[in-house]
Regions:
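Hot-dog-fold acyl-thioester-processing enzymes
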Residues: 1-68, 131
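Active-site beta-strand->loop segment that positions catalytic residues and contacts the acyl thioester
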Residues: 70-84, 92-98
Length: 131
C-alpha cells in the first residue's frame, strides 16, 4: 500500500532551473540540437527543449510510483536556461482497484512571472504492491 493513498485534489510540486549543461545533455540524448538549443540568445540563454521541460511532471510521477499510460502536453511559452520553473501536478480523479490506484492528473508549469509555460495531463496507475 502507498504511504498515503492518492486522493482527488492532492497537489504535488517540484521546481527546477535548467542549465546550459542540461540542454546540451538532453540534446545529445534526444538528437534535438537545433540552433535555438545550442546557440545562446542576446542574453546568453538557451531555449530549453519542450520535452526537457516535460520531465518535470515525470519527476513527480516517479516519486509517487506512477506508471503512466497516457500523457499529453501543450507547450505555451518558451523556457530558457536560468529560469526557475514550478511544476504543479494535481490529482483530478482516482479509482481504487484491488491491486492498484488508477489516477488522472492535471499539470501546470509556470515561470518566475507566473506565466504558464506548459500544460499537461496524464493517466496512470500506482500499484499497491510497489509500496
Amino acid at each position: 500500500m502507498p504511504a498515503t493513498e492518492p486522493e482527488e485534489g492532492d497537489v504535488h510540486t517540484v521546481e527546477r532551473t535548467f542549465t546550459h549543461e542540461d540542454v546540451e545533455c538532453f540534446g545529445e540524448v534526444s538528437g534535438d540540437r537545433q540552433a535555438i538549443h545550442t546557440e545562446p540568445d542576446d542574453e546568453g540563454r538557451l531555449m530549453v527543449q519542450g520535452l526537457l521541460t516535460a520531465t518535470l511532471p515525470t519527476a513527480i510521477g516517479g516519486d509517487l510510483g506512477v506508471l503512466a499510460r497516457t500523457m499529453e502536453y501543450e507547450f505555451r511559452e518558451p523556457v530558457y536556461t536560468g529560469e526557475t520553473i514550478t511544476c504543479e501536478v494535481t490529482v483530478t480523479t482516482t479509482t481504487e482497484r484491488d491491486d492498484r490506484y488508477e489516477i488522472t492528473c492535471a499539470v501546470d508549469c509556470r515561470n518566475e512571472d507566473g506565466t504558464t509555460v506548459m500544460r499537461s495531463g496524464f493517466e496512470g496507475v500506482i500499484w499497491k504492491d510497489e509500496w
